[in-house]
Amino acid sequence: MKYYSSFGFHDFVICCGYKGHVIKEYFADYYLHRSDVTFDFSAENRMTVHQNVAEPWRVTLVDTGLNTQTGGRVKRVQKYIGDERFMLTYGDGVSDIDLSALLAQHEASGKTVTLTGIQPGGRFGVLDLDESGGTVTGFREKAKEDGGWINGGFMVMEPEIFQYLTDDTCILERTPLESLAIESKLGIYKHNGFWQCMDTQRDRSKLEMLWGSGHAPWMRETV
């Protein structure tokens, strides 16, 4: 969220699932988590917050179910998004992607969805591209490491996407995106910089080490 905010995007809708109440409690007490606080338990029973930590955010937390698939979760928050273009990302990946450039390419392309393509290791499925290299034509699951592009998240979507989302069983990365690829409505923004997901303990250790160094690639000042 801080990374998006550093590009001027401050309105967030979070699709909550497992332990969504913990996320709600975190934001309810956000200023307590981020500030020094004095609790005076004398007769006055007073609490003093020594820093007023403020973010330029508007955050909507939506319970989208425990077992709902990715497409179903997006469908459930449609009423909070309305008919606006929006960005979508997963909660387990970080990058130094230029979000402004991603948005600009999407706007110029006329695609329904533009996803960010990255080239990590070989444990991911890859994307098939057309001759121009700017349109996704299909998906190949669990291919060997061959320099192919994968979906790194960090997507831009037009409200038309909701026409492709059905119910809680809908997997965004399957029928909806595959249908858009067949219709030449799925674009790709190629990112050659830093990208890392956190799927394993090893991934977590790597990211925590980068963060602890004070030079994590995804660190930016909030606008």
Spans of model-derived segments:
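Catalytic-core segments of class I nucleotidyltransferases/pyrophosphorylases
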Residues: 85-87, 94-107, 119-122, 135-223
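Residue-level detector of beta-strand structural context in well-folded domains
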Residues: 125-127
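Extracellular glycan-interaction surfaces
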Residues: 116
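Conserved N-terminal catalytic core of the sugar/cofactor nucleotidyltransferase
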Residues: 1-90
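Residues at the starts of beta-strands that form the adenosine-phosphate
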Residues: 10-12, 112-113, 185
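Short acidic-glycine loop/turn motifs at beta-strand connectors
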Residues: 129-135
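Residue-level detector of conserved, well-ordered beta-strand and adjacent loop positions
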Residues: 62, 130, 140
